[in-house]
Swiss-Prot record:
Mitochondrial matrix compartment residues: 46-59
Signal peptide annotation: none
Binding site for Cu cation A1: 161, 196, 200, 207
InterPro entries named in the record: CcO_II, CcO_II-like_C, CcO_II_C, Copper_CuA, Cupredoxin, Cyt_c_oxidase_su2, Cyt_c_oxidase_su2_TM_dom, Cyt_c_oxidase_su2_TM_sf
Keyword Chloroplast: no
Membrane topology designation: Multi-pass membrane protein
Obligatory cofactor(s): Cu cation
Gene field: MT-CO2
Keywords annotated in UniProt: Copper, Electron transport, Magnesium, Membrane, Metal-binding, Mitochondrion, Mitochondrion inner membrane, Phosphoprotein, Respiratory chain, Translocase, Transmembrane, Transmembrane helix, Transport
Major location (coarse): mitochondrion
Enzyme Commission designation: 7.1.1.9
Cofactor binding note from Swiss-Prot or TrEMBL: Binds a dinuclear copper A center per subunit.
Annotated protein name in UniProt: Cytochrome c oxidase subunit 2
Pfam families xref list: COX2, COX2_TM
Length: 227
């Protein structure tokens, strides 16, 4: 989860988020190099009175500043496309969870189990226990097994919502009448927080998401107790 005054992204918990962080660093380095080059050229233009008479009519220079940006765009596009394809792949999920957005709460249905469904509301500030997080805690957490591929089917009952958990690299729109899907996979156990990331009305800020990733044994015990 994010902390006050935090710089940078949240700690990666899934392989997709690790890839996204690597891509962020890769792109940031390219942007830094381009910005440094531009600032250097501007400083030269401002500090020197010397000019090249054929600068504005140099075929070689035009060739360079046409090919070089194209090569840079390719360096950015290739890893980006690779990650997009990875995010779309869902290979043999062990579990499917249907997520529905409402104004202003989430409902979850474990489609592999009979009658395992519940609504998830934010806990009001006055009802929080010591150590719990304001505007992030819910009355029913989404319990999932760790280190296993899980398919999330995401839609909405009313208006546009967006189901997002940053530390897992997840952000999928919940659109009425349309079913989107995403893959959830966690490398470690723990609580992972998210929020609705699409302005959906006056209580948009009060739609937190809490995933509780546990070992498979504990998940089986939890699911048996819920049925």
């Amino acid at each position: 989860m994010a902390y006050p005054l935090q710089l940078g992204l949240q700690d990666a918990t899934s392989p997709i988020m690790e890839e996204l962080m690597n891509f962020h660093d890769h792109t940031l380095m390219i942007v830094f190099l381009i910005s440094s080059l531009v600032l250097y050229i501007i400083s030269l233009m401002l500090t020197t009175k010397l000019t090249h008479t054929s600068t504005m009519d140099a075929q070689e220079v035009e060739t360079i500043w046409t090919i070089l940006p194209a090569a840079i765009l390719v360096l950015i596009a290739l890893p980006s496309l690779r990650i997009l394809y990875m995010m779309d792949e869902i290979n043999n999920p062990v579990l499917t969870v249907k997520t529905m957005g409402h104004q202003w709460y989430w409902s979850y249905e474990y489609t592999d189990y009979e009658d395992l469904c519940f609504d998830s509301y934010m806990i009001p500030t006055n009802d929080l226990k010591p150590g719990e997080l304001r505007l992030l805690e819910v009355d029913n957490r989404v319990v999932l097994p760790m280190e296993l591929p899980i398919r999330m089917l995401i839609s909405s009952e009313d208006v546009l919502h967006s189901w997002a958990v940053p530390s897992l690299g997840l952000k999928t729109d919940a659109i009425p009448g349309r079913l989107n899907q995403a893959t959830v996979s966690s490398n470690r156990p723990g609580l992972f927080y998210g929020q609705c990331s699409e302005i959906c009305g006056s209580n948009h800020s009060f739609m937190p998401i809490v995933l509780e990733m546990v070992p498979l044994k504990y998940f089986e015990n939890w699911s048996a107790s819920m049925i």
